[in-house]
Amino acid sequence: MYLSIIILPVLGSIVAGFFGRKLGVRGAQIITCSCVIVTTILALLAWVEVGFNNIPVTINLFRWIDSEWFNIIWGFQFDSLTVSMLLPVLIISSLVHIYSISYMSGDPHNQRFFSYLSLFTFMMIILVTGNNYLLMFVGWEGVGVCSYLLVSFWFTRIAANQSSISAFLTNRVGDCFLTIGMFAILWSLGNLDYATVFSLAPYINENIITIIGICLVIGAMAKSSQVGLHVWLPMAMEGPTPVSALIHAATMVTAGVYLLMRSSPLIEYSSTVLLICLWLGAITTVFSSLVGLFQQDIKKVIAYSTMSQLGLMVVAIGLSSYNIALFHLVNHAFYKAALFLGAGSIIHAVADNQDFRKYGGLREFLPLTYSIILIASLSLAAFPFLTGFYSKDLILESAFGQFTFSGVSVYAISTIGAIFTTLYSVKVIYLTFLANPNGSLMTVRHAHEGDIFLTLPLVILAIFSIFFGYLTKDIFIGLGSSFFVDNSLYVHPVHEILIDTEFGVPTVFKILPFIFTVLFSILAILLSEFIPGSVFNFKLSRFGYNLFGFFNQRFLIEMFYNNYITNLVLTLGSQTTKVLDKGSVELIGPFGLEKGLMNFSKSLTKLSTGVVTSYALYILLGLISFIIILYLSQISSSLIVLLIILTLFSLNFNKQ
């Protein structure tokens, strides 16, 4: 059963990719969807068996690297963390496969698309189930390559190619530091196997663990789109919408958070790394929510909300609340996939227009999509008793429950981020469904709900967005829950704050984020509905124009990267090419050698004078040289050759 979870998606990918021409579009769709759905059912069984019965499973297939003390086994482990990660990955992957049957129906390259989707799922399973850092890195690189292939799926579009290259190169920065971290683990601990590394971690110097932890955090920053290495995330929206749902809801962007959770027995011994995670997540949350508020593309707004929620997960990791981070990761995957697929349904209905300022009044034409996006947005805003409520607010409470300066500061910053998150959710719903129609008459007239393949995944995700958090809260975060007794998530006793969070935080600070989000949402709707001129006039003022431009241009971070990093590197590269490659190297190498030989040959030809006495002199000099060579045989051959060349040149010089 456990090997089937790993093998089935790659079998579907191979069949659809290599034999898609023989199978046809429908055959490729049936095979890939069947493989992923069966894998999902098996993963649910594994979740029950491993999680509830506390029976972790390890499978060692074969020895991959065997070099004296360095041994890597191609092995997989299924513990409570692994099966919990497989749950959203495979459920959402199977729903995206079904959704894509309708969404990509008019595309001529269906087989290739479904092959890429299944391959992406397989690589994510490898990343999650690998029992050592090297095997995890195989999956890590695999999802990077698959995201490149999927984002640039419509390869004739320049924007898609640019976005895929941006995502690929930005992730290479994180991969570089992750590789350095793995080398540091190998140097300090002598192995990359999780069990060995985590059992030796308490005996290692804290400074070494800090260096390793910082490298792992930078690796996670790129993959999980934390501020600084986040620039690829909104650009990746150029791919098909099912790809956006798969990459940015449950799979690739959560890989960095998974890496930090898996490394919890390591980073728990470095308070510096935990503090970095705490502040990094808080800054990411407020940064992304501010930028998302000023975006006009419906998919980019949802992408920035993903970034904001990932920031909250990293905050939870910084608080050592790994179970809350995992719970929020799983919850977020469902309602974020619902938002992305709902956005895809809207885009499909309005002739592929993504600017939601040109929507308006779609509630009458897309009632099901409106209901699902409303449910998912309320869950995103942590509305009471929906899925997001049980994890998002608990992260904010945990920050306050640490009762430190950093904890309380992060609570305040994250609350501001949560307020802005709710504001742009309200903005999307209002401008898309409730405002007066702003699109063309033909677009509105032809707006319609999709078929069963388009709507069934949305309904299933909406059900998860309502009930999943309530049904599983005691499993993941309940006091005394035995779900993580296998130590897949390790919390140092010094960092245990769950009881303080539950019983020590005043009730007013628990409900404060919800009160603020509701008040600001009502204020935003009232301003837009009854005083629309005030917002418009503010935007036209000089201050409002500059403010809007600053946030709309994403804090000018990309401009800074282009002007001061990319251009600097390109200038340095061109100067290196000019001075070294085309300068010194060519002067010494091909050009210099050619000129030297040409000059030498010209000097030799000038010795041919046609005068007999000159030839007699050459013969005499040759005899003398031969005698000198015989008597000075102890001198090195290179010195002799040098003497001969100098003699010839001196003769030539005297001749001239």
UniProtKB/Swiss-Prot annotation:
Q: How does the protein associate with the membrane?
A: Multi-pass membrane protein
Q: Which residues form the signal peptide?
A: none
Any one GO BP annotation for this protein: electron transport coupled proton transport
Q: Name one GO cellular component term.
A: mitochondrial inner membrane
Q: Which UniProt keywords apply?
A: Electron transport, Membrane, Mitochondrion, Mitochondrion inner membrane, NAD, Respiratory chain, Translocase, Transmembrane, Transmembrane helix, Transport, Ubiquinone
Main enzyme class: translocase
Report the EC code(s) recorded for this entry.
7.1.1.2
Under the heading Pfam families, the entry gives:
NADH5_C, Proton_antipo_M, Proton_antipo_N
List localization entries.
Mitochondrion inner membrane
Concerning Gene3D superfamilies, the annotation shows: 1.20.5.2700
Reactions mediated catalytically = a ubiquinone + NADH + 5 H(+)(in) = a ubiquinol + NAD(+) + 4 H(+)(out)
The family classification in the record reads:
Belongs to the complex I subunit 5 family.
Specify the protein name.
Answer: NADH-ubiquinone oxidoreductase chain 5
This chain's source organism reads Cryphonectria parasitica
Gene that specifies this protein: ND5
